[in-house]
């Protein structure tokens, strides 16, 4: 296991920024709140620990990256408080979602990790996705030790290609194993260049992702939004479809939000899933 040194820096974030809500918002599956109060984030070969100090102050400690990398990751160039204000008053349900989800931000994550993660996510609950992704990382990801904490980086395409079908199945991937194998083989050979796809416009990016084995509209939209920062893309899963039927009379509301559609979707998703689970727990 490779022991790494962290760079510490005091950072101030005055905009909407709630780490618990971000972690539970369904867009990321490896970030975690640790028992010592730190929040750990992994992205590609980069590692970050955030310790809240109060009044928007955080002790940030990172490896394999810099401050600008994480500012982009957390979309700190966008004013979410102002965005919520601009969206308010359009529907009572959206207003409740905006208030409830204050602190959520769209994370700009690693496209490779997003592709594999959301391939795994199909027909799985969020806890099950987290478990499968963590098993995959522990199976072949690079192990690191940082200030007493041991982590595993997300596997590269080459590392995944080195796993047998039985090893992948052992990570709880089930029928998704074939999808993971095909994506890893294409990315490893260069047939699939996820970095180059960043230059494509939204429609072309979406279409290219749909060509991959196992990628449907929901997975493609998730990769576009959370891997490439395409905020006009709004993934529609079971929760969102239920919300569209119950709150919007079956009419898809997202096209009217244009470049903010994906952000609106995230507020609605978080509110719908959180409140539905809360009601279920009370029964």
Segments predicted by a language model, with ranges:
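HhH-family (HhH-GPD) DNA N-glycosylase catalytic core used in base-excision repair
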Residues: 1-283
